[in-house]
Each structure stands twice: as structure tokens, then as C-alpha cells.
């Protein structure tokens, strides 16, 4: 099993780099340069290629092997990072990202989205049912580690690490990962698709996807389970910045510290699943804990507006805020690992020729749910105010707890 998990870990790690770059590093840098919460939030529209994965998932199902797709897409990611290295960084006083930088970041997301389809195809085909728990733990932990390194890690180093050196470092990482994708023995053993296995070209593809047992419920769950968490997670660090926290502090708190807790949560989730915990039972417990944690974070936000409240070093509020960030990420990590295990189990119920497309369909809905609130959180905060906005997030976080009562028996 280690021969399968090690290359998966390396490839999922580099897959998390663009997400960390755009979810942690760029928003804080842009907010520190004076952009509104709305403008900062709307930069997440650069994730749009991830929502179009179904456009090329059937092609990955029918043409070539995961190793070929992984190698080519990862090489292209290194090339885009090399081009970003020669461009100047965003400057103070700019109203947004330069058009050229936005275009290259869009290409970066396109390459990462193609890589994601190929990598998920490999995982669905490579892992046995008993390996789903450890496999999804590796997937989530490695992805979050890559996100933390590209987000919080680079944010801490950014005052001393130049923009060109940052992207040259990322380019070298991608090219090493491309070599891993090509050389890993486990990836070369997967067979080329046979003609009889091809996904049919028909207008009934969506009908075929929804006909897979458990798909309707899983699709609804993954679309909603992160709405409240993602909205709060996107907005809370920016509000802390407005209350006096520095960008380097937030790099440590919401980048490295909180993501470390998220990785710990994902690891715990994987360990519990490996000990034969049912994913849906685990979700029921942890979703309730996550809801309570978000309620505490909302109370902290209200207290921050009271006279004398501060997140200065040595204050109780600073410790409470840090604990709040860590708890949300920890519970979110457990929830993510269990949810991805449910998704992969559901996709394995599909015919082999449809598995990559089916998993991409679920993963696209999962990402859409996260992007929806991550992108609109700033707009909601500017229009409703942060307090009412967090009340909405609490209601949204309660929805998946209720949704679990409708889960089909074939996913338990």
C-alpha cells in the first residue's frame, strides 16, 4: 500500500500549492494594500476552471493514462510559475491584480484542475475499498500541507523572499513532481482504457451520473457541507487584520498554525476510519462540534467590537482568537476526510468507465459550495455587516447536520 500512497502524497501536495497561494497569500497581501473586502473576495473567481472539470473529465476517462495526464499538466504548472516569476508583483495603490498576472493565475488554475481530474482518476482506480480511509487521509493531509506551505509559509517569508524567487521555487517544485508522476511504478501499472470502456458520447451523461446509487444525496451534501465554514474561514482573518493583527501574524495563525490543526484533524479522521468507524457516523458527531466552534468564533467577533478589545500580544483575546481558528480548522479537517471518503465510495459504485467523470462531478459540486461563500463572503460583509453575516454562516453550518438524517443506506 505504501507504494501507492507515497506518490499520491507527493502529487496531492503540489496540487494544494495554487489553493494556498490564492486563498491565504494573495487575499492578505491585497487587503494590506487597501483593497475592499468585496474586491479581495472576488479574486477567488480565478478558481473558475475548477468548476469546469466535467468538460475534460470524460477525455481523461477515454484517452491516455493518469501518468501521461499528470506529467503534462504538472509540467505546464511549472511553466506558468516560471512566467509569473518574470512579472512584477502587485503594488500598493493598485485597485486589483494586473491583467497579465490574473491571466497567468487563471492558467495556473486550469492546469491544476486538469491535474486534479487525472489524480482523482488514479486514486479511484488504484485504491482498494479497505484503502479508502488511509488513501483519503493522504489526499487531504498532503493537499492541506501544500496549501499551508504556499499560503502561510510563503506569507511569513514574503518580506524576505522576492516575488521572482517565490515563483521560481514553485516552478522547480512542479517540475520535480512531474518527474515523480512519470517515474512512479504504481502509476505506470494502470491499463490504457479499452474501447468497450469508453464513456458514451450522449446527452444522457448527467442522467447516467445521477443514476449511480447514492449520487443525489451525496451531491446535495457536498454542495452544502462547507458553506458556513468556508464563509467564516475566508472572512475572519481579514476582519482580524482590520482589528490590528499584522499580515505576518495572520500568516502564522491562519496559514501555518491553523492548517497544522486542520492536518491533525484530517489525520485523526483517517485513523478513525481505518479503525472501522463509519464515515456518516463520524460526520454526525464532528459536524455538531464544528457548529459549536463556529458559534464561539461568532461570539468572539461580537466581542472584538467592544471597547478595549484587542488582539495585541499577551492579551486573552489573542489567545481566544488563535484557539478559535485552530478548532475550526481541526474539526473541518475531520469533516473533509470523512466526506471525501464518502465521495470516493460513491464513485466506486459507478461503472469503471464513468468513475473519473463521476468523481469529478462530485468534486466540482464540493468546490462550488466552498467557492460560493468564499467569494461572496466579502460582498455579504460589506452589505450586511460582519455580525449578521456570521449569523448566516451559523445557519448554513447547521444544514449538513440535518442533511445526514436523509443519507441512503448504501453509503454507510
From Swiss-Prot:
Gene3D superfamilies: MFS general substrate transporter like domains. One of its GO terms (molecular function) is transmembrane transporter activity. Pfam families: MFS_1. Keywords: Membrane, Transmembrane, Transmembrane helix, Transport. The keyword Cell inner membrane does not apply. It is a multi-pass membrane protein. It is found in: Membrane. It comes from the Eukaryota. GO terms for cellular component: membrane. In brain, expressed in the cortex, striatum, hippocampus, hypothalamus, thalamus and cerebellum (at protein level). Widely expressed with highest levels in kidney and liver. The chain crosses the membrane at residues 10-30, 40-60, 68-88, 99-119, 152-172, 173-193, 204-224, 252-272, 291-311, 320-340, 361-381, 384-404. Induction: After 24 hours of starvation, up-regulated in the brainstem and cerebellum and down-regulated in the hypothalamus. Following 8 weeks of high-fat diet, down-regulated in the brainstem. Belongs to the major facilitator superfamily. This is Major facilitator superfamily domain-containing protein 3.
